[in-house]
Amino acid sequence: MGRGTWSWIVPDGLWEIAKPLIPPSRVRPQGGGTQDTPDETLFAAIIYVLVSGCAWRQLPPCFGISKSTAHRRFLIWSRAGVWGRLHEAVLHRLDDAGLIDVTRVVLDTAHVRAKKGGEHTGPSPVDRGKPGSKMHVLSDANGLPLLVGVSAGNTHDSEGLKPMVEGHQTRHDPHRGRYFKPQRLHADKAYDRADLRKWLRGKRIGVRIARKGIESSERLGRRRWVIERTMSWLSGYRRLSPRYERDPRNYLAFLGLAAALCC
């Protein structure tokens, strides 16, 4: 398979969205050197690592690039914020097509084992105290991931509610003529705190959080099932679960790319 033919790994249209976001490669002032690998090839290789979970050194020969080149470019693009902006650009496309529904948003968290430790890891209460992280996801009513985040495995789920809601409201461009405040927020009993309910109401967001020992999870689950599907999508990317990245910025970069792919 020739260079630049990556339809088997890159979804239709995604490269066209990503291409304007890629920072230009640095030009050697002295000239010379080997020819740069096409950005589209590097983009496909990074997606392959995310999907397969392989180490950089295990990239297939069909990409025609070294592990150091692929990893270095991933780090450069990650520090430039490419993956978060790609996710946001995909969301804008969907919103323009009327495919995002924020009448209801759904929040959930998943535990992820952290193989190598690092920042934003901690003893997991559901994995015998082994190092882990939590993946936080806010989706629209259809399960499209609107915002993703990561925290230590011993952080309570409820601690992620405020930053996720605030992050969703502030990251979208207000000049697009759309107000992104959700009308209602659905979450499970892990988020059942009086102060969070009061905070949401103060923002004029309807609260549909299951109450501990009172409300049936089955009834509220009619709205929350979409986030379970989204979590399943994200967990299917093998570079995310388990977590191999010691640097949380790298893990969040892969998570942002996965969110864009899920959309």
Language-model features: locations:
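Short alpha-helical elements
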Residues: 1-263
